């Protein structure tokens, strides 16, 4: 079952959505095929097996068609029928959530059917809702442009006097729509493609001119188009990470109006703030660890942590580790309990055990931490290196210096390979392993150098795990009256 479109679609919807799908399938407006209803009933009875993809096509066919001989073409038609209904259900969901799209569509129907009274009544209603809208993002300008276009296309006695004003507003909204499309696209792509934001100034048509326009009209945009202004600030901190004041300005705006933002806009803003905060943290700005924690909590409080029905393995562990580094162990444990079950199946066991190992280590339960680490597979570069860091820290606390040598050697070889993590994050790991090697040597054969090691670490620019290394080197140096 795992190879068919139906399985992929089922995995993409929540249990609540699956249950809601029943009403959609039973409605004769959307479905008149009784075999599709039978298929849905079978999947509902065997929901867990369906989610795992462990149901065979023969089992499915037998339930729907009884003892009839299996027919491959009939089976594919059956599963395709339910897949198409799920597609329609998802589109219907989207349609139901977009009130502006619905009203614009109805306005277009009134226009083409030539019912001016209904057109004018609805037009005024739409206008009032646009005027009071807080979330003036990409879809807002798209829908309002469409609205003005329809008004201008249907000139009647009621709106002829507004023609010039509406024309001007339509082109202003078109400009904002183009600006939002441009800077939103650049913002999203830059989260995945290193260096893209700076290349965009040269390679993306009109991007540089848009930045020039927004800079020149900053105060006007800030007052009249606050969402555009926030997206502009996001671009500015990506272009120049040193401009921290813009990050904190966005944060203040979120704090003041958090309940007003739509889920999609809030998610986009938070993801970009998170990306910025992480980059600041791994490049040596320790204060941004608290910002990462703040963003993760806001994501959780607004039910934005999950992407669809899952949480990414790397993000899951990073939340736990960043919280642990701040000493927020209780919240980290709550996070593990709340979201561990949503890890992708490939990452679930390793992700949970790596996270639990981190928490156990912070609680000085080194035996439990090591027991969890045994169950971790090195699924990607971040997991592999984080796993090695925790192993070394646990072995050091247990004075297992023989095991330390083996881990250090494998980590050293691994870092010499070309691995797909940012140069900044890689540098953090390199520094940790280098200083850990010195710490181990000091602890075993050169205790007299502990004071020098502590001073050397103290003079370093901040890097991840530096505090732990400082603490351990200080413990070695204490007998020498540091």
Regions found by a protein language model. Name each.
Residues 235-237, 276-282, 318-325, 359, ...:
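Residue-level signature for tetratricopeptide repeat
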Residues 119, 199-212, 240-253, 283-297, ...:
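Helix-turn-helix repeat elements of alpha-solenoid scaffolds
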Residues 7-10, 107, 317-321, 354, ...:
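Amphipathic alpha-helical repeat scaffolds
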Residues 27-29, 130-132, 216-223, 254-266, ...:
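Solenoid-like repeat scaffolds
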Residues 350-425:
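C-terminal structural cap/anchor segments
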Residues 3-19, 23, 27-31, 80, ...:
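C-terminal non-catalytic interaction modules
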Residues 1, 222-230, 264-277, 307-317, ...:
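Generic helix N-cap/helix-start motif at coil->alpha-helix transitions
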